[in-house]
Regions:
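Phosphate- and other anionic-substrate recognition elements at nucleic-acid/protein interfaces
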Residues: 1-152
Length: 152
């Protein structure tokens, strides 16, 4: 299969940390190399990860969307790298891939071959508008609870 992104990273995000696999396609007879590292979800660590991926000349990053754990990684990496957010159901329903390390390697491999379809992640102005709309809805509901008498 043709490799579209010779330098690709796959990130499997969990509650505590993220496993990152950087896949570098070998040239000629050289084998493809993959290195897996673990990064915490602290902002400073994610920024260090961004610098690491830039230093590795990674052109494509694939992040598995799990709960809300993906958000800090996506938002901090997206401004400097080509990041694709993928649904876990679409890429990891393969038997035998049960660990975070193997999932990260699988994501990097799929990303390198261009076999992932990125999910929609709204741009910042849309996110801000959504947050404001949610906040207004919560305030309106709280106001309604205070005004209406309890039903018997």
């Amino acid at each position: 299969m043709e490799v579209i992104h010779p330098r690709c990273a796959g990130i499997d995000v969990s509650k505590r940390d993220a496993k990152v696999c950087v896949r570098i396609q070998g040239e000629g007879r050289r084998a493809t190399s993959s290195t897996v590292s673990t990064w915490t979800s602290m902002t400073s660590d994610i920024l260090a990860l961004r610098e690491h991926l830039i230093a590795q000349q990674v052109t494509c990053v694939v992040i598995e969307s799990t709960a809300a754990y993906w958000k800090p990684f996506y938002f901090l990496l997206n401004d400097a790298l080509n990041v694709g957010l993928v649904n876990a159901r679409h890429v990891c329903n393969v038997p035998g891939r049960k660990t975070d390390v193997s999932d990260a390697a699988w994501l990097a491999d799929l990303g390198a071959h261009g076999l992932v379809r990125a999910s929609f992640a709204p741009p910042e102005p849309v996110r801000i508008l959504r947050d404001l709309t949610r906040a207004r809805t919560i305030v309106a509901q709280a106001r309604t609870k205070e005004i209406e008498p309890p039903r018997v």
